[in-house]
Amino acid sequence: MASVGLQFQASAGDADPQSRPLLLLGQLQHLHRVPWSHVRGKLQPRVTEELWQAALATLNPNPTDSCPLYLNCATVAALPSRVSRHNSPSAAHFITRLVRTCLPPGTHRCILMVCEQTEVFASACALARAFPLFTHRSGASRRAEKRTVMVEFFLVGQDNGPVEVSTLQCLTNATEGVRLAARIVDTPCNEMNTDIFLEEIIQVGKELGITPTIIRDEQLKTKGFGGIYGVGKAALHPPALAILSHTPDGATQTIAWVGKGIVYDTGGLSIKGKTTMPGMKRDCGGAAAVLGAFRAAIKQGFKDNLHAVFCLAENAVGPNATRPDDIHLLYSGKTVEINNTDAEGRLVLADGVSYACKDLGADIIVDMATLTGAQGIATGKYHAAVLTNSAEWEAACVKAGRKCGDLVHPLVYCPELHFSEFTSAVADMKNSVADRDNSPSSCAGLFIASHIGFDWPGVWVHLDIAAPVHAGERATGFGVALLLALFGRASEDPLLNLVSPLDCEVDAQEGDNMGRDSKRRRLV
């Protein structure tokens, strides 16, 4: 499905399915609400109204189902009729699966997505995941004509009018962000090294009229970024810290998105085995998601100061590699004894969040990373893990995930019990836990938080996306939709406002009893 152009249109028009194959997709109760007059022009002369009604009658989703309408040129597919409380009402993961398996082949195709207005954003992002951009298959390079898929939404429920032009533009930018992130993650390190990743950042900056700040190689050492420098100094392509900054007039707060961009993770001298190293090109998934989300957020209009911070390095093996027992001085001013060079992501992120706090003056810091293998055990393949110093923002992340399809579930936040795992006799802390059975994903996040301080009055959110960053052999672009939804209230776009997790309810006794300031509640 490479090299597919994805187009969102208010109306895809009518066409014989033999010349333009068609997939009709939605929950069964929604499909029954589509009048024949709306689909007739997309199905005739191959499919009659009687056949259409008969196909709907045969569908029995458990959890999904599909029925061919005409050869392999037209198909109707049903999503789950109900989802559990920890899933998205859009059933986003099933949308991606059904598109991959049920969309008829062809050069120019059409998808009619039937859903409610509140599910449009999540559905569009799920559709985008089915069409990855990166491929080196020789057949794709020989294909002369670019394939296109037109997507039309038919809205049911209260807001069942036509999709507005502003919504289509938002969907275009959001899905381009998802596919950009997935392309970067899918690209192997011999083509997506730190230099090339910087070119991606520079290109996005040029598109937005922003010149990035770049600190790299020996400059990192000179300026005190011991975490990023220590992780990446053994690689042929040097490490870098890059920042894209959007500072509009009238901004009332400063937000920083910090992404882990390990373009390849061998594990360093604590080297990974032959079965665990393949796939480590995906260790830049956090930075890729931040880049895709930043591009879409600024294009849709962002009202507050927004900084995208990219912590780029390759964790390589070489004569200059960091050794276990080495001690690094990080940008926070704290020293770290290295007891595991394969726990490198937290080192680069520690420098990134420290920079966001000290130099950017951020009120809200979100770091996103493929940080721990234990995340997949803790919250599974579909739900990212969230760790935060705010009960309200924890609830907001979960709610945003359900609204956008990038699902999230909380980790235990208890630094007074867990941070002792990093105790060192010779430095401020070690970089890896003493007991790997004691909530290691939470501990990894707490390591990052310690470099801005557990008593920091702002909002800190850590998102571990190690498992959902890919599905099988393909990247998902996970995190782009989540960031756009989580900060939807800061956007000028009505659709992002709609998916923003407003008015999250939390138990006041569970929340912020450490003297936080009021800024932490301004977006949710």
From Swiss-Prot:
<keyword id="KW-0464">Manganese</keyword>
<dbReference type="GO" id="GO:0006508">
    <property type="term" value="P:proteolysis"/>
</dbReference>
<dbReference type="GO" id="GO:0070006">
    <property type="term" value="F:metalloaminopeptidase activity"/>
</dbReference>
<feature type="active site">
    <location>
        <position position="346"/>
    </location>
</feature>
<feature type="binding site">
    <location>
        <position position="344"/>
    </location>
    <ligand>
        <name>Zn(2+) 1</name>
    </ligand>
</feature>
<keyword id="KW-0378">Hydrolase</keyword>
<dbReference type="InterPro" id="IPR011356">
    <property type="entry name" value="Leucine_aapep/pepB"/>
</dbReference>
<comment type="function">
    <text>Probably catalyzes the removal of unsubstituted N-terminal amino acids from various peptides.</text>
</comment>
<keyword id="KW-0031">Aminopeptidase</keyword>
<feature type="binding site">
    <location>
        <position position="265"/>
    </location>
    <ligand>
        <name>Zn(2+) 1</name>
    </ligand>
</feature>
<dbReference type="InterPro" id="IPR000819">
    <property type="entry name" value="Peptidase_M17_C"/>
</dbReference>
<feature type="binding site">
    <location>
        <position position="265"/>
    </location>
    <ligand>
        <name>Zn(2+) 2</name>
    </ligand>
</feature>
<feature type="active site">
    <location>
        <position position="272"/>
    </location>
</feature>
<feature type="binding site">
    <location>
        <position position="342"/>
    </location>
    <ligand>
        <name>Zn(2+) 1</name>
    </ligand>
</feature>
<keyword id="KW-0862">Zinc</keyword>
<comment type="similarity">
    <text>Belongs to the peptidase M17 family.</text>
</comment>
<dbReference type="GO" id="GO:0005737">
    <property type="term" value="C:cytoplasm"/>
</dbReference>
<keyword id="KW-0479">Metal-binding</keyword>
<feature type="binding site">
    <location>
        <position position="283"/>
    </location>
    <ligand>
        <name>Zn(2+) 2</name>
    </ligand>
</feature>
<feature type="binding site">
    <location>
        <position position="260"/>
    </location>
    <ligand>
        <name>Zn(2+) 2</name>
    </ligand>
</feature>
<dbReference type="GO" id="GO:0030145">
    <property type="term" value="F:manganese ion binding"/>
</dbReference>
<keyword id="KW-0645">Protease</keyword>
<dbReference type="InterPro" id="IPR041417">
    <property type="entry name" value="NPEPL1_N"/>
</dbReference>
<protein>
    <recommendedName>
        <fullName>Probable aminopeptidase NPEPL1</fullName>
        <ecNumber>3.4.11.-</ecNumber>
    </recommendedName>
</protein>
<dbReference type="Pfam" id="PF18295">
    <property type="entry name" value="Pdase_M17_N2"/>
</dbReference>
<feature type="binding site">
    <location>
        <position position="344"/>
    </location>
    <ligand>
        <name>Zn(2+) 2</name>
    </ligand>
</feature>
<dbReference type="Pfam" id="PF00883">
    <property type="entry name" value="Peptidase_M17"/>
</dbReference>
